[in-house]
């Protein structure tokens, strides 16, 4: 079986690799129990044409659809996207490929493109649990992570302003770190944005380092205007780092923590919020007593570790795939 992904060292690479690692363990368990009909070989590649393709839905539609209709007519698209780019699709263009996306929000945008859509969230990485449960010290008030674009859809500009205005201990992992310097004490490349505010370039850290930073933060500030899922929010919940999140798009479905009022007006794929609301919610969160914080942190952590457990998520995924493709892949 071939697992394809759109890029290396990106979020799609992360979720594809985690699925493959779980699948290899699942295969061994099945073989040990006497089931020798499970797939023997699992390969990963970049690009189109996999049996399961971890990819941005818009990218698949524009670049892989034509290829897959000929070379991989039964491939399963495992993807998400925060944007509804594609419009004016005629009935004869609707794809027969199965789309397994990560939120009802995403599914609602792409029903015009796919005849059959299932919703299965991402799972958390078991490695994260082994890392974050060893972290005891909170060094930062808030952390935010994201690859931002010119329209600031991740809300990093707002996050920085909030941190500056409220004098928060702030760490950001993003593609918006300019004039990068080197922190001699850790040898990690980072930039000092302001007093107690640092930025670390996106994808320069190991997964363990990212998980450790999340666990060292009290809150995760999730100000995205649009998300098809939002993996760092899941990672923060698993660590017990409480999300302060925009109450819209995919976050409205699965994020647990402290919501920020949001609204969608002219665009179905974009949620706005007021800066004053963000400041008020963040200030309130910062004033939470230690006992209240500990209770909320524990509840968020326990619920997320149950609902997004790899066995729960991936078994659902493979059951859907086996049910809807022409032959069992697993």
UniProtKB/Swiss-Prot annotation:
The keyword Transport does not apply. The lineage of its organism: Viruses, Adnaviria, Zilligvirae, Taleaviricota, Tokiviricetes. Belongs to the glycosyltransferase group 1 family. Glycosyltransferase 4 subfamily. GO terms for molecular function: glycosyltransferase activity. Keywords: Glycosyltransferase, Transferase. It comes from the Viruses. It holds the Pfam family Glycos_transf_1. Its EC number is 2.4.-.-. InterPro entries: Glyco_trans_1. Signal peptide: none annotated. This is Putative glycosyltransferase ORF330.
């Amino acid at each position: 079986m071939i697992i394809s992904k759109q890029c290396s060292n990106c979020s799609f690479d992360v979720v594809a690799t985690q699925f493959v690692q779980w699948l290899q363990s699942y295969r061994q368990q099945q073989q040990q129990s006497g089931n020798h009909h499970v797939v023997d070989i699992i390969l990963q590649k970049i690009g189109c044409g996999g049996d399961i393709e971890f990819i941005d839905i818009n990218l698949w539609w524009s670049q892989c659809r034509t290829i897959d209709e000929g070379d991989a007519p039964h491939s399963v698209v495992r993807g998400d996207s925060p944007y509804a780019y594609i419009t004016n699709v005629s009935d004869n263009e609707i794809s027969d490929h199965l789309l397994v996306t990560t939120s009802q929000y995403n599914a609602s945008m792409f029903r015009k493109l796919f005849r059959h859509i299932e919703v299965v969230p991402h799972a958390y990485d078991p490695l994260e649990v082994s890392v974050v449960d060893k972290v005891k010290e909170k060094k930062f008030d808030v952390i935010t992570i994201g690859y931002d674009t010119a329209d600031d859809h991740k809300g990093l500009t707002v996050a920085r302003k909030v941190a500056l205005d409220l004098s928060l201990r702030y760490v950001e992992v993003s593609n918006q770190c300019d004039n990068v310097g080197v922190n001699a004490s850790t040898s990690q490349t980072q930039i000092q944005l302001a007093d107690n505010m640092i930025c670390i370039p996106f994808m320069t850290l190991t997964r363990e380092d990212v998980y450790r930073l999340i666990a060292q933060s009290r809150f995760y500030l999730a100000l995205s205007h649009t998300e098809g899922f939002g993996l760092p929010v899941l990672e923060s919940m698993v660590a017990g780092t409480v999300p302060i999140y925009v109450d819209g798009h995919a976050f409205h479905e699965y994020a647990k923590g402290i919501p920020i009022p949001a609204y969608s007006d002219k665009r179905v794929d974009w949620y706005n919020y007021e800066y004053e609301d963000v400041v008020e919610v963040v200030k309130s969160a910062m004033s939470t007593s230690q006992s209240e914080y500990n209770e909320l942190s524990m509840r968020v952590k326990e619920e997320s570790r149950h609902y997004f457990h790899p066995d729960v998520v991936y078994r659902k995924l493979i059951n859907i795939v086996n049910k809807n493709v022409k032959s069992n892949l697993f």
